[in-house]
Amino acid sequence: MDSYYKNKKKINFSKMHGLKNDFMVINCIKKNVFLTSHIIKKLSNRYTGIGFDQLLLVEKSNSLLTDFHYRIFNANGNEVEQCGNGARCFGLFLLLKGLTNKKKILISTKKKPLTIEFLTENMIKVNMNEPDFKFYNLSSLQNVLDNNFSIKLINENLICNLVSIGNPHCIIKVQSIKNAPVNIIGDNIEKNPIFPEGVNVSFMEILNKKHIKLRVYERNVGETKACGSAACAAVAVGIAQKLLSDTVHVELLGGKLIIIWKGFGTPLYMVGPAKHVYDGYIYI
């Protein structure tokens, strides 16, 4: 048995989740960890690996202006720009491992830096920056109304809204999320050639100006229990179109978030829980 592990690398990790959106978190600050997409896929397998929606790497900051660097990989091994639920778990990991004693930290990402503020032991507030409604090349889309776009599917044109929260989102307003064909439409839109890097697709049911329900198809993954950046994107669309107030409770399959946005020219905030499940190690 000892010979089996002789040429393998031991990796310590934590299993965490935010509203059942689950993560494998690895501390890479003192020990550089390189994982290929093939290895990440194997680790993400819920039957033969650890099992997770995303892998989060905690890295040393490359700048004096930020405290840490935050990297995110989907279960298929692709590195992505943003994960809101992951950001809260990233912050809790830093606290639990004694890597910071600050009440507020600034972390760098593949795109824009994020501010993480610790409100209570497991309730965390993240500054997700200002939503970007102008990041798409819209030449291939028909502008139906202000920030309403028509995407041609197999049998119909679907009205949606496009916004970036550091990663791309397509928001569809529905009367009820209960019977929404999340995986069918989500997969169809994600594979549309107008989104060469894919897109996260969310179905939003507005209950009132302070409360929405949301189901999310995450690119390269499928429907997930929760997606923090999707909650931010949906609320941003609702506020921009004056359908929602500046503080909104978002009900996802995995739990609830609070999203706060005062409007254009200001940052958007996400408030929600993070949970540590267990620590472990694996040989690869």
Curated annotation (Swiss-Prot):
Site label Could be important to modulate the pK values of the two catalytic cysteine residues, positions: 169, 218
Keywords: Amino-acid biosynthesis, Cytoplasm, Isomerase, Lysine biosynthesis
Residues given in the record as substrate binding sites: 21, 54, 74, 84-85, 167, 200, 218-219, 228-229
Lineage: superkingdom: Bacteria
Residue stretches spanning the membrane: none
An annotated GO cellular component: cytosol
Pathway listed: Amino-acid biosynthesis; L-lysine biosynthesis via DAP pathway; DL-2,6-diaminopimelate from LL-2,6-diaminopimelate: step 1/1
GO MF annotations in UniProt: diaminopimelate epimerase activity
Gene3D superfamilies given in the database record: Diaminopimelate Epimerase, Chain A, domain 1
Site (Important for dimerization): 278
GO terms, biological process: lysine biosynthetic process via diaminopimelate
Family annotation (Pfam families): DAP_epimerase
Reaction catalysed by this enzyme: (2S,6S)-2,6-diaminopimelate = meso-2,6-diaminopimelate
Enzyme class per UniProt: isomerase
Compartment(s) where it occurs, according to its Swiss-Prot or TrEMBL record: Cytoplasm
Annotated catalytic residues: 83 (proton donor), 227 (proton acceptor)
Listed InterPro entries: DAP_epimerase_AS, DAP_epimerase_DapF
UniProt EC number: 5.1.1.7
Subunit-level organization: Homodimer.
Chain's role: Catalyzes the stereoinversion of LL-2,6-diaminopimelate (L,L-DAP) to meso-diaminopimelate (meso-DAP), a precursor of L-lysine and an essential component of the bacterial peptidoglycan.
HAMAP family reported in the protein's UniProt record: DAP_epimerase (MF_00197)
Family classification: Belongs to the diaminopimelate epimerase family.
Name of this chain's protein: Diaminopimelate epimerase
